[in-house]
Amino acid sequence: MDITFTAGRDVLEKAVSRIISVCERATAEGKNLLPYFFHIRVDGYGSALKLSAGNAVRNIEILIPDVSEHEAFCFGVYGSYFHNILKALPSGDLTFTLRDVCYMHNGASTLKFQILGANQFPAVGIRTDHDWWEVNYRELFSRLKRLVYCVDTQGLINKNYVKAIHISPENFTCTDNRRMSLISNGIIPYNGRILLPAESVSSFSSLFDANSPTGFVYIDGHAMSFSQGNIHASTRLLGYDAPNFESVIPKGPCVVCEADRDAILMAAKRAVIVAKKGLGKESLQPISLTLSTNKMHMNLENQGFGITENIDVKYLGPDLTVHLDLVLLFQAIKNIAGDIIKIEMRGDNAQIIITDHIGDHRNVIMPILLAR
């Protein structure tokens, strides 16, 4: 069953901008809360939308048709990608339809983009409140703070990083190998490890009531959220090896090519310069990447400005094209180290994954798909 709700574009964009400003100020103060991930919770009965990233939260009034049929639900989107989309759209009401992906309609056009956390509900592509896992907060934060202490004093890893929790279907296990069982029978559909910012451990532990230690943990995409009563806090994940939310909805052929990082980076940089002449800094900057035998064609054309780059790559598969936001592509390549990068494409209706040659670092870029 599809879930549909409507929100004003201007109100939503202003809320996103304010959250980004809060996160950027916090980051400037060393709190490391860049809004890479937005957690969106919709209360079906109260017709309210809660948008949060880091410690910043905004509530927005929305309209949900047939609200009696819907419980509260939540889903995730990438922050900068979602913000760029909103800025590119004109004023007016935006209607969101959630299936395996999200369709955003503004009357004249429909924008389709992938949402995070869809693996539990393949039919509708969302998570509900039933996917919060109940844990003992007193034990959780005691373990996490002990790990921070070990990192700071023993120099096990960079002090800004805490390899905090291993996740399995039955329990959480901190890296001191002491098991911490879940209180409820909530289902965790994967095994893996997540990586948290150290500063979040200390700040979050002081937010919650130690005399009432039971709380809930929610992990979705690039964020881990904590909830106890009326207190909620979220932190972005600095890294993880599971769950693989990027491949929740794989569609189209999956192909991999290898390319020289500097060659693609310079081509993307030249395209950024051209794009700013025609589109301006505040607009969505769509670019197409086409793979053919041992070639990648990067093409940008808008409002009379255009550029085409042909890059040598290692690729012998079928021709394939994806449409992306140029700035996000440039940032992703710039953040990858090494001489050689691997690019995984799943077609126009999915995403691309860019990794370094040995697979230690990964960036994921959602697609742009406009249907008029």
Residue locations for each model-derived region?
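Structural preference for solvent-exposed beta-strand-turn elements
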Residues: 1-372
